[in-house]
């Protein structure tokens, strides 16, 4: 009988450190779904349970639950999903620019 205590991270403190170069490259290779793929790798990754700080009980519903300030909070789904998408799009763009600059400096 194993007991696992997982401390869920605050939505604003989501950990991206587990992502490897390969993870980012795979996201970018997914072309039309690159941001969605990144969100899945970060927030819906069973190997990184502490990042599972988003809960959508119904795809058709108007609300989403996020773990923030040590409690689950009900938020407007459209607004939160738009913010989540935008933030992860920026993360992916920043990683790509740094990656390309690193390649350029090697040439």
Task: Say what each PLM segment does.
Residues 1-107:
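Extended amphipathic coiled-coil helices
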């Amino acid at each position: 009988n194993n007991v696992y205590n997982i401390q869920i991270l605050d939505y604003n403190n989501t950990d991206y450190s587990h992502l490897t170069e390969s993870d980012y490259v795979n996201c970018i290779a997914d072309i039309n779904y690159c941001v969605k793929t990144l969100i899945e790798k970060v927030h819906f990754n069973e190997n990184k349970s502490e990042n599972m700080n988003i809960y959508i009980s119904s795809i058709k519903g108007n609300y989403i639950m996020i773990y923030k300030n040590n409690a689950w909070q009900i938020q407007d789904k459209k607004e939160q999903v738009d913010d989540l998408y935008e933030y992860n799009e920026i993360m992916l763009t920043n990683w790509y620019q740094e990656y390309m600059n690193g390649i350029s400096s090697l040439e």
